[in-house]
């Protein structure tokens, strides 16, 4: 009898413990997915800040996707409009007309306060900048873009910035001009061949072609003389961009990226290959740098300084100032941050030149006058190409310029 009573007590104790744990988990989940979003909605509503209503788990994502799909399904109106905002951020354009310049939207259970009033934006970015941190990206996007300079903080950010800044000095970037010129010349020759084969005229998607030019330039800026090896690695990272783009449009379900789905397994495999390739490349370049220093040939003779060589040589022969893992992340960040933005700039500038042929003529005449009929632009030519620089500048009257900046509130400020 005593054994049966003890067994019964133990069974009831385990049952009570299990139910209590389940109840606690349920309360935590309910608070994260329902009560907390509702409290935040009420908090902002009392301050006069409203927005589309929060829906359990998905937030406003369904409405966002629907608005973006609708905007992408039809051409911009009018066709020669430079107002790209209704197309690029259709949900923001739509809700701003309803809720005003400041409103609340939901990416799943995560709120985002959108602000477009210039004075309030200035206060956030300048006057009270210490109260805000950098925005923490979607985990899949963060895996792709790397934990590099754009997401670092404090002393580590200062170290990386100091080491990498020389790569962006004008004198150093000018040394890339011949490589970029040859890439663009090869691109135009292929277009000429395609046009000749099609009877003198052909339609091309310039965005796809410009991606190749941007990728080649960024790879050379990152890896320098190890261009061929770096290109293989960055091509794999380009494949990962499709997964990140898709994930960014979905609700972030905690832990979902750890499930062995088909796309997750492919993403993991690509990430492993990228890391393995970068580690091998960094190791080879580190050995070359050590041998060069041993032979007193550490100076590059005034040549181009790529990002990888700057990070490897940062410690001046002592213990590495930037570990290999951080070098890997910086390489990923630079490729992710530079490729798409450069492609978009070139594509939009080309569209604007097509819409305004008079600027084409002015830029073409300037290039011929400065560089000649057959000579590629060099670093000596670049400062003289004023009209060409102006056509790709946000200050150009035909450029539509929109600022999109994301920040998160510092936790210490909210406590």
Locate predicted features.
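Cytochrome P450
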Residues: 30-34, 46-47, 225, 314-325, ...
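Compositionally biased low-complexity segments, especially N-terminal hydrophobic helices
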Residues: 1, 11-16, 291, 296-299, ...
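Conserved cytochrome P450 K-helix E-x-x-R motif and the immediately C-terminal K′/meander segment
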Residues: 75-100, 276, 377-415
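C-terminal helix/juxtamembrane-tail motif
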Residues: 1-9, 407, 412-414
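Cytochrome P450 heme-thiolate monooxygenase catalytic core
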Residues: 133-144, 152, 156, 175-344, ...
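N-terminal membrane-proximal hinge/A-helix region immediately C-terminal to the signal-anchor transmembrane segment
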Residues: 3-145, 153-155, 159, 181-189, ...
């Amino acid at each position: 009898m005593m054994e049966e009573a003890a067994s019964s007590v133990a069974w009831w104790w385990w049952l009570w413990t299990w139910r209590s744990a389940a109840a606690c988990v349920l309360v935590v989940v309910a608070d994260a997915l329902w009560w907390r979003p509702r409290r935040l909605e009420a908090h902002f509503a009392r301050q006069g800040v409203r927005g589309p209503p929060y829906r359990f788990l998905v937030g406003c994502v369904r409405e966002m996707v629907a608005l973006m799909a609708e905007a992408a399904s039809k051409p911009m109106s009018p066709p020669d409009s430079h107002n790209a905002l209704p197309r690029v951020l259709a949900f923001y354009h739509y809700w701003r007309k309803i809720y005003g310049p400041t409103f609340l939207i939901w990416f799943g259970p995560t709120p985002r306060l959108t602000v477009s009033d210039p004075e309030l934006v200035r206060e956030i970015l300048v006057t009270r900048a210490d109260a805000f941190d950098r925005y923490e990206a979607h985990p899949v996007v963060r895996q792709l873009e790397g934990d590099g300079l754009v997401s670092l903080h404090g002393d580590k950010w200062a170290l990386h910035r100091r080491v990498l800044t020389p790569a962006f000095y004008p004198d150093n970037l000018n040394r890339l001009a011949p490589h970029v010129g040859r890439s663009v010349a090869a691109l135009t020759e292929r277009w000429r061949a395609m046009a000749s084969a099609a009877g003198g005229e052909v339609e091309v998607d310039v965005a796809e072609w410009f991606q190749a030019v941007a990728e080649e330039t960024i790879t050379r800026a990152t890896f320098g003389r190890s261009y061929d090896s770096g290109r293989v690695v960055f091509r794999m990272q380009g494949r990962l961009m499709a997964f990140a783009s898709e994930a960014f449009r979905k609700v972030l379900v905690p832990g979902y990226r750890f499930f062995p789905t088909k796309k997750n397994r492919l993403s993991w495999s690509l990430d492993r290959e990228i890391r393995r390739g970068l580690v091998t490349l960094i190791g080879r370049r580190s050995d070359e740098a050590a041998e060069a220093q041993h032979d007193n040939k550490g100076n590059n003779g005034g040549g181009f300084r790529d990002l990888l060589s700057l990070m490897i040589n940062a410690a001046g022969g002592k213990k590495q100032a930037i570990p290999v893992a951080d070098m890997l992340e910086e390489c990923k960040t630079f490729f992710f941050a530079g490729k798409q933005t450069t492609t978009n700039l070139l594509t939009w500038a080309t569209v604007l030149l097509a819409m305004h042929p008079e600027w084409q003529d002015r830029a073409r005449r300037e290039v011929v006058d400065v560089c000649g009929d057959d000579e590629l632009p060099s670093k000596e030519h670049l400062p003289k190409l004023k009209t060409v620089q102006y056509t790709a500048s946000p200050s150009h009257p035909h450029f539509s310029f929109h600022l999109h900046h994301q920040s998160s509130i510092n936790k210490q400020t909210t406590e």
